[in-house]
Amino acid sequence: MESTERVRSHFERDAQRFDAIYEEEKKSAFARFVDRYVRGVVVERLHLVRALAPVKGAWSVLDMGCGPGRFSVDLAKRGAARVLGVDISKEMLDLAKRAAAAQNVAERCEFVLSSFRDLQVKETFDMSLGIGYFDYLENPIEDLQKMAQFTKGHVLASFPKRYEWRVPSRKLRFMLTGGFVRFYSKAEILRLFASIGVPADRLYLIDLGRDYVAVARIV
């Protein structure tokens, strides 16, 4: 099975549990402990994107691998005039659409079932997100290049660290469930952006413990 199909299958099965990571009040004390210390970066990334989002104007967002729409809906609530969320999991997109409707931002959010490589758009975005997206790509450079082409502003993308204490358990979990996951060194991330024409002076990395988040200015 190709990696895209393995990832799709994994998140179709795991959509409800993944979305629940963001719901502190609905979990047992043990589940809160596990999510905070093992998967806490998921929520930390949301806080970081909030802090880096534009605050003025009619700005737009492309959210690649949008999952249950937590980032898309949150940014629409914070003023984004146009949000395009893209994912390969119908189950995830169903959650995203329900969340947008529940928060009264459905008219500003569009959710598309597609792989990024098959996506066709004729617009550019002020902010493009690849949060929890590059974890699951065997050949990330094509997707990163396309994301930059769709952006006139900033790309924010997370990359799980290659050398981090949670790597062995995460590798094992995906291996046992038939999924695919990859990890990155800081040098590899810098090379990826350099290969698509983003020099070091337009890129910085934020260390979130388990992940690096790259913030690249696209001109």
Please state what every model-predicted region is.
Residues 127-138:
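A short SAM/SAH-binding and catalytic strip from SAM-dependent methyltransferases
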Residues 162-180:
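Short, glycine-/aromatic-enriched active-site segment of Class I SAM-dependent methyltransferases
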Residues 1-53, 58-65:
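Conserved class I S-adenosyl-L-methionine
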Residues 180-197:
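Short alpha-helix
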Residues 141-153:
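A short glycine-rich, Lys/Arg-flanked "PGG" loop and its adjoining helix->strand segment in the class I
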Residues 62, 70-116:
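Class I SAM-dependent methyltransferase SAM/SAH-binding core
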Residues 152-160:
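Conserved beta-strand signature within the Rossmann-like core of class I S-adenosyl-L-methionine
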